[in-house]
């Protein structure tokens, strides 16, 4: 089935008010196909800023993280209600940097995913293996374990986009080949079909999140199970528009 091409831009802890204005205005003036969905994730301090500047119907805004409580004494965290209140519609959960630097477990990410979905935002759920896990040949075992934790808590995947991000490729300039990515994405979809249903799995978009850029994005064009990209550093640059248009 035809799934809407999806491009996520994760700004990470980068950007200023001025630079984010420049990025959003670049998107506003760009020619973006009507059948592409774009989601940008600026730092939390600039969510409101990005939402207010955005003029494109195909573009929406995501938070890079959210906590699993509605409110309370959780210094430094952002609630889903606060994210929604400023007009953001998505949240990125399970990113490898959250798993690695902030020690977020599969179960904790699953709990956050369920809470976010129940609270009315859509989720970009990140999964992926480290270099050590890749070298051991356990990539599929790792991503299935990460998915199973969420499957145990979430039955309705309508508002979930899965992002496969090989950790060894993030910020390193390394990237899986488009054939490698297709093989893993296909296995992920087969796993979801087994656990949910074939029809449900066919509707879930699976993004590639390993150092996608303006040059390599086009090589994924004919890969049936690669439904878009979760872009890191390149989302801060003009080439982000090239990635968005890589399937035109």
From Swiss-Prot:
<feature type="active site" description="Proton acceptor">
    <location>
        <position position="165"/>
    </location>
</feature>
<keyword id="KW-0413">Isomerase</keyword>
<dbReference type="InterPro" id="IPR022896">
    <property type="entry name" value="TrioseP_Isoase_bac/euk"/>
</dbReference>
<keyword id="KW-0312">Gluconeogenesis</keyword>
<dbReference type="GO" id="GO:0005829">
    <property type="term" value="C:cytosol"/>
</dbReference>
<feature type="binding site">
    <location>
        <position position="10"/>
    </location>
    <ligand>
        <name>substrate</name>
    </ligand>
</feature>
<protein>
    <recommendedName>
        <fullName>Triosephosphate isomerase</fullName>
        <ecNumber>5.3.1.1</ecNumber>
    </recommendedName>
</protein>
<dbReference type="Pfam" id="PF00121">
    <property type="entry name" value="TIM"/>
</dbReference>
<dbReference type="InterPro" id="IPR035990">
    <property type="entry name" value="TIM_sf"/>
</dbReference>
<dbReference type="GO" id="GO:0046166">
    <property type="term" value="P:glyceraldehyde-3-phosphate biosynthetic process"/>
</dbReference>
<dbReference type="GO" id="GO:0004807">
    <property type="term" value="F:triose-phosphate isomerase activity"/>
</dbReference>
<dbReference type="InterPro" id="IPR013785">
    <property type="entry name" value="Aldolase_TIM"/>
</dbReference>
<comment type="similarity">
    <text>Belongs to the triosephosphate isomerase family.</text>
</comment>
<feature type="active site" description="Electrophile">
    <location>
        <position position="95"/>
    </location>
</feature>
<comment type="pathway">
    <text>Carbohydrate biosynthesis; gluconeogenesis.</text>
</comment>
<keyword id="KW-0324">Glycolysis</keyword>
<feature type="binding site">
    <location>
        <position position="12"/>
    </location>
    <ligand>
        <name>substrate</name>
    </ligand>
</feature>
<dbReference type="InterPro" id="IPR000652">
    <property type="entry name" value="Triosephosphate_isomerase"/>
</dbReference>
<comment type="pathway">
    <text>Carbohydrate degradation; glycolysis; D-glyceraldehyde 3-phosphate from glycerone phosphate: step 1/1.</text>
</comment>
<comment type="subunit">
    <text>Homodimer.</text>
</comment>
<dbReference type="GO" id="GO:0006094">
    <property type="term" value="P:gluconeogenesis"/>
</dbReference>
<dbReference type="GO" id="GO:0006096">
    <property type="term" value="P:glycolytic process"/>
</dbReference>
<dbReference type="GO" id="GO:0019563">
    <property type="term" value="P:glycerol catabolic process"/>
</dbReference>
<dbReference type="InterPro" id="IPR020861">
    <property type="entry name" value="Triosephosphate_isomerase_AS"/>
</dbReference>
């Amino acid at each position: 089935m035809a799934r809407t091409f999806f491009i996520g831009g994760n700004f990470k802890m980068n950007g200023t008010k001025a630079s984010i204005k420049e990025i959003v205005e670049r998107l506003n003036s760009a020619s973006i196909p009507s059948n592409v969905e774009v989601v940008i994730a600026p730092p939390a301090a600039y969510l409101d800023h990005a939402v207010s500047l955005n003029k494109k119907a195909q573009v929406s805004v995501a938070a890079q993280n959210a906590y699993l409580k509605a409110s309370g004494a959780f210094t430094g965290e952002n609630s889903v209600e606060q994210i929604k209140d400023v007009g953001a519609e998505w949240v990125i959960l399970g990113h490898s940097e959250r798993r690695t630097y902030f020690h977020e477990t599969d179960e904790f990410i699953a709990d956050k995913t369920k809470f976010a979905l129940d609270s009315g935002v859509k989720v970009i759920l990140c999964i992926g293996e480290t270099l050590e896990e890749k070298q051991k040949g356990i990539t599929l075992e790792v991503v299935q374990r990460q998915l199973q934790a969420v499957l145990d808590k979430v039955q309705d995947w309508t508002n979930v986009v899965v992002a496969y991000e090989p950790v060894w490729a993030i910020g390193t300039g390394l990237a899986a080949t488009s054939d490698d990515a297709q093989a893993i994405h296909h296995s992920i979809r087969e796993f979801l079909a087994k656990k949910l249903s074939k029809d449900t799995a066919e509707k879930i978009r699976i993004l590639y999140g390993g150092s996608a850029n303006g040059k390599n994005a086009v090589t994924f064009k004919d890969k049936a199970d690669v439904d878009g990209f979760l872009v890191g550093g390149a989302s801060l640059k003009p080439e982000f528009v090239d990635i968005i248009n890589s399937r035109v």
